[in-house]
């Protein structure tokens, strides 16, 4: 029984550390949709800059070799079995601030 309590405590400690050290960034597709849809959450290290988080979110939600939504680095929550890549006009939510993907980078909304 003591081993079970230790395992449970370790599990809770790991979850707490993850919560304290990571941000969940939301990717919202709206360019070609009739209304904006959150399609993915990506866990990012809190020490990353906003620009680094935006660029990583863009990179991880674009298909280069394998379909991006099958990656274990992305929590895909889209309504379809497949999903297009993130494009100009889509959004990324970092904390409480939304950024629009523009032709050359990002613009705070």
Protein language model regions, located:
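N-terminal non-globular leader segments, chiefly Sec-dependent signal peptides
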Residues: 6-73
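Short intrinsically disordered terminal tails
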Residues: 1-11, 108-109
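Short alpha-helix capping/helix-loop boundary micro-motifs
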Residues: 70-82
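Proline-rich intrinsically disordered, low-complexity coils
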Residues: 2-4, 36, 79
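Short, compact, well-ordered microdomains
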Residues: 82-109
């Amino acid at each position: 029984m003591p081993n079970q309590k230790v395992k449970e405590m370790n599990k809770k400690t790991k979850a707490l550390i993850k919560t304290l050290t990571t941000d969940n960034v939301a990717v919202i597709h709206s360019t070609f949709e009739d209304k904006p849809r959150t399609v993915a959450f990506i866990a990012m290290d809190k020490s990353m800059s906003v620009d680094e988080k935006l660029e990583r979110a863009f990179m991880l939600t674009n298909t280069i070799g394998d379909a991006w939504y099958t990656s274990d680095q992305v929590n895909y929550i889209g309504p379809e079995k497949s999903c297009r890549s993130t494009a100009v006009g889509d959004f990324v939510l970092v904390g409480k601030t939304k950024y629009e993907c523009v032709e050359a980078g990002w613009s705070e909304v």
